[in-house]
């Protein structure tokens, strides 16, 4: 009787063990069938393997099929790019990923580009529109002219792919006209590259040779003029704004003279500009021991909230002070960037010899950026009181926040409030890297050794109980 009871107990344990193992096998098979977005969690500090909400806005709006061709030889696949493409594949039924091995299809890329195509390059296509994404546009390399060293510093796969998708599905892209004829600065390399990435077409124009802003302008950029516009040009720009036009202005102090006609665009709408260089003596509001390199308070708005959410700081060097007052015009004026109460404007401008307050200097606080909107006709003017906001050096000092601020401003102007800039992701950290042999050992331990050990322990317990029962 005791032996029969022990046998039943042992049989029960074996059956239970078998059932548990069967459940584990089924769960494992089910888990492998799930998409990577469900089974994998991105714990990297820069969310290297994650898709941002900006991409989801673009992808979820797709109504046409988009094909992403992954040009790569067998065995040369980049793991990060592969995981990123898996994310896009699971994000929408309108996106298809197709791998093209150049050894098998040696002429495939010729119809898209004349460049020599490296492994892990991509081609995004929708209908008769396409864009080629070079591997060097995905892994961004930077270097130092002083050290001669260059290396891969950031991963821009998501930004490049999402930009390409947006480009191929939209035949009409925003167009920015750049005012010239007043010694305006050239666009910085970083700014120009970002405009291309954001699919914004650019064209220069002069109001000296035409009597109005071109009809196909989505907005006009006035970038760091060194001399003033004429009264006639000012009237044309004001008429453009009053009739629903969009303006983005980055204009700070000039080394000699003033820009009264240009800044009268602001004063007509209740914003006064002081002709000087703002210094801020509050240590929390300037950088690099230079009180004219300002770190203003970022005020909450649709344009600035993405920076606030990520705790970024804008750096605004050599700026004029703006003061928001009253106006009889039907406009709303929103301050985007502000100094501390300890700021003042140095009347000496570029010729200042001291940061101390002197006679003739104007007390702050000041706004350094404003957003002026019209309720009646959707006119909008965003104005930053520094000519160096997207200068490559100062943008680098801000960790890219300055460029993000300007690109968010452009998104606001062209009505793409959700499609703000997608930042590249830094690679300046240590990876957790394991070899293939270590990976194989871990798989063997998890899939083979652990279940066998579990089964062996169960058998040992059954045998021990049986012997104990026999002894009794």
Language-model regions: role of each:
Residues 2-472:
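Short, surface-exposed patches at the edges or C-terminal ends of soluble domains, predominantly
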């Amino acid at each position: 009787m005791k032996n029969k009871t022990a046998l039943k107990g042992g049989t029960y344990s074996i059956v239970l063990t078998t059932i548990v193992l069967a459940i584990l096998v089924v769960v494992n098979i089910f888990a492998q069938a799930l998409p990577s977005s469900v089974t994998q969690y991105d714990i990297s500090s820069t969310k290297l393997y994650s898709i941002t909400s900006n991409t989801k806005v673009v992808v979820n709006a797709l109504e046409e099929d988009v094909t992403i061709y992954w040009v790569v030889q067998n065995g040369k696949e980049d793991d990060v790019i592969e995981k990123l493409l898996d994310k896009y594949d699971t994000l929408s039924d309108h996106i298809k990923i197709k791998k093209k091995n150049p050894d098998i299809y040696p002429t495939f890329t010729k119809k898209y580009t004349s460049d020599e195509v490296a492994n892990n390059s991509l081609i995004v296509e929708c209908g008769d529109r396409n864009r080629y994404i070079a591997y060097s546009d995905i892994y961004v390399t930077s270097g130092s002219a002083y050290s001669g060293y260059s290396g891969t510093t950031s991963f821009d796969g998501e930004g490049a792919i999402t930009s390409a998708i947006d480009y191929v599905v939209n035949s009409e892209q925003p167009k920015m006209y750049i005012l010239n004829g007043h010694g305006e600065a050239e666009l910085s390399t970083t700014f120009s590259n970002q405009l291309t990435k954001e699919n914004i077409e650019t064209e220069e124009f002069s109001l000296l040779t035409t009597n109005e802003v071109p009809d196909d302008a989505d907005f006009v950029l006035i970038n760091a003029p060194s001399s003033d516009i004429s009264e006639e040009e000012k009237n044309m720009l004001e008429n453009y704004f009053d009739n629903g036009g969009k303006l983005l202005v980055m204009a700070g102090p000039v080394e000699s003279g003033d820009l009264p006609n240009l800044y009268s665009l602001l004063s007509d709408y209740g914003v006064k500009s002081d002709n000087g260089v703002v210094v801020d003596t509050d240590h929390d509001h300037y950088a690099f021991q230079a009180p004219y390199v300002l770190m203003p308070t970022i005020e909450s708005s649709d344009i600035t909230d993405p920076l606030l959410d990520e705790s970024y700081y804008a750096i605004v060097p050599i700026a004029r002070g703006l003061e928001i007052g009253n106006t009889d015009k039907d406009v709303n004026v929103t301050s985007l960037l502000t100094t501390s109460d300890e700021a003042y404007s140095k009347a000496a401008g570029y010729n200042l010899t001291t940061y101390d307050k002197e006679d003739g200097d104007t007390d702050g606080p000041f706004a350094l950026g404003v957003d002026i909107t019209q309720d009646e006709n959707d006119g909008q003017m965003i104005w930053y009181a520094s000519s160096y906001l997207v200068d490559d050096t100062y943008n680098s000092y801000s960790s890219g926040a300055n460029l993000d601020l300007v690109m968010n401003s452009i998104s606001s102007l062209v009505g793409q409030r959700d499609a703000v800039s997608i930042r590249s992701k830094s690679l300046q950290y240590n990876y957790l890297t394991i070899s293939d042999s270590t990976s194989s050992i871990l798989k063997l331990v998890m899939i083979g050794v652990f279940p066998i050990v579990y089964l062996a322990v169960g058998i040992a317990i059954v045998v021990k109980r049986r012997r104990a029962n026999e002894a009794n």
